């Protein structure tokens, strides 16, 4: 789907410096539309109120299709990130399907509880999907990080909006297409490629119920600010870098 304004940006193979393709450049208008669609899907109950057995079936199908398209997705990840194809095969073809399978298998094994009370009182602890969840994904593990955010939220019955890094949007878009093939209903899983303004719009949106962010410590702090200035949505933060390396002239 094109961005509302029709804008696009190029994604580059960092190993060659050559253009791969043009991708929709989303902005706050697209965020508003995606949140509206996600909320409508959530409120309809088409996914949020579907049976655990149905969600399990769809997520296991999702895992199966990710395995089926593992080689294709690994190549796509490699050319979009510049990573070794061997690394991409391990992450994309092996680990990503495993995560969807794990959460799919978990769905019908998590239950509510009856709290201890006196005989005249009944206390029930019920697990419910929080609503519309935004996942902000970095460039270093684009598909894996997207899956880590998608799978548990979808398993719980939430609607999910993924904002991939502008450097590496391709596999997140492809995974959303595979999700539709697996049976994820329209509006339940959305991907918004674009720049930092898209992440900020998601963080500030009052109809986004939770944010999961992976990225720098500085930008993670912004999301706490966005939450405090909007609807106090819960924000899960995975911040900071590790494993630096030194490149010498020779």
Label each residue range with its predicted role.
Residues 17, 55, 153-154:
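Hydrophobic alpha-helical segments that mediate membrane insertion or helix-helix packing
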Residues 16, 25, 166:
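Short, glycine/acidic-enriched loop or turn micro-motifs at the edges of active sites
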Residues 20-110:
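Glycine-rich loop-to-alpha-helix module at the N-terminal edge of alpha/beta enzyme cores
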Residues 13-18, 76, 237:
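Short acidic (Asp/Glu) and glycine-rich catalytic loops that position anionic groups and cofactors
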Residues 1-16, 22, 41:
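Hydrophobic face of amphipathic alpha-helices that form TPR/SEL1-like repeat modules
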Residues 7-8, 19, 96, 129, ...:
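A generic secondary-structure signal marking the coil-to-beta-strand transition
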Residues 111-250:
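Rossmann-like NAD(P) dinucleotide-binding subdomain of oxidoreductase/dehydrogenase enzymes
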